[in-house]
């Protein structure tokens, strides 16, 4: 079953320097997932200043360039995983949060886990 995990964090954390330990631990996590077949794709996202939002409201399509001042939390990274169950997906989400806890003092955020339709 495939799931998308989305690491959500405050925009200021996205704009600050990520400690090297996070990259090292994420690299090990990614390598393990590639070897055991659970990791499909993994990536980090740039701050919202490098993005845009395209929306549809009241019959009109509008594009707004970042940064997104009204957003409290933004997705800073993601992983697509292929696991046997929702419980296994949650366990991998816990591991992603543990990487941040162990390597980024003061970091706060969440890992949203959503099953991919049709998987």
Each PLM stretch: what is its role?
Residues 1-119:
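Conserved, structured core segments of small domains
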